[in-house]
Amino acid sequence: AIKLIQDSTNRLIRYLQFYRYLYSLASEDSKTSIVEVNRLATDFLKSKNHNIELIFTRLYSIDINDHIAQIIICLIVVASNNLSKNAIIKVELEIQHDKFIGMKIVVIATNLKFDQNKTDILLGTGANSSDHSSITIENVHEYYTYYLITEYGYKLLVTPLIDSVEYTLML
C-alpha cells in the first residue's frame, strides 16, 4: 500500500511539474535547456503508463527560448494522445549557429489514432479565433498549441503516413 501511495505521489508530482511548465507564461528572455525539455517530456510519458520511447536525435547543450520549449512539449503531448500502448516518438531538432530553426516529431506506432478534426485545429483550418464556443475540454490543447505556433511566427505541417505521423515545425 505504501509503494502504491509513493508511486501515485511521484506520478502526480511529475504531472504537476510538467503542466506547470507547459501552461506557464513564457517571457521572451527566459530560456530552458533541451536536456530539461527532454526530462520533462520523458517523465510525462512515463506517467501515462504507456510503453512510449522518446528519442531526441540530438541533445544539444544549448538553451532555447521557453516558448519554443513549450511548443515542443505541446507537440509531444499531441503526439502521445494519438498512441496506443507501444510507440516511438522521435524528436529531431534543427539548430544552426546555436539558434533553433525548426524541428520534426515523428510518431511511429501500430494502431495509430489520427484525429483529423484535431489536426485541422493544429493547422488553423479548424481554428476560429472569434468563435470560442468551439473550444472544448477535448480540443483545448490543440487550440493552445495552434495559438503558440502562430503567436511566435512558426508554421506547422502534419503528414500522416502508414503507422506513423510527422509533425514538422518551421519558421
Model regions and ranges:
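Glycine-rich/acidic phosphate-handling loop/turn and adjacent ATP-lid/helix
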Residues: 99-140
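Conserved DHp (HisKA) dimerization/phosphotransfer helix of two-component histidine kinases, i.e.
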Residues: 2-52
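Conserved ATP-binding N-box helix of the HATPase_c
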Residues: 66-96, 141-151
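Short C-terminal beta-strand
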Residues: 165-171
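C-terminal transmembrane helix-loop-helix hairpin of multi-pass membrane proteins
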Residues: 132-135, 141-144, 148, 156, ...
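Conserved short strand/loop->alpha-helix "switch" segment adjacent to the catalytic nucleotide/phosphoryl-transfer site
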Residues: 51-78, 129-134
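Glycine-rich ATP-binding loops of the HATPase_c
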Residues: 153-160
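Solvent-exposed beta-strand sheet faces enriched in polar/charged residues
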Residues: 55-57, 92, 159
